[in-house]
């Protein structure tokens, strides 16, 4: 899923 590519910086789990 390509969403994880840019979803990491807007998601709290990416912190």
Curated annotation (Swiss-Prot):
Summary of the function given for this chain in its UniProt record? Has antibacterial activity against Escherichia coli, Salmonella typhi, Streptococcus mutans, Staphylococcus aureus, Listeria monocytogenes, Vibrio vulnificus and Vibrio parahaemolyticus.
* GO cellular component term of the entry, any: extracellular region
**Mainly localized where?**
secreted
Q: Does the keyword Secreted apply?
A: yes
* Domain of life of the source: Bacteria
Q: Which organism is it from?
A: Limosilactobacillus fermentum (Lactobacillus fermentum)
Task: Tell me the compartments it is located in.
Answer: Secreted
Q: Cite a single GO BP annotation.
A: defense response to bacterium
Q: Does the keyword Isomerase apply?
A: no
Keywords assigned:
Antibiotic, Antimicrobial, Secreted
Question: What protein does this entry describe?
Answer: Antibacterial peptide fermentin SNR1
């Amino acid at each position: 899923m390509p969403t994880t590519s840019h979803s990491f910086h807007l998601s709290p789990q990416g912190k």
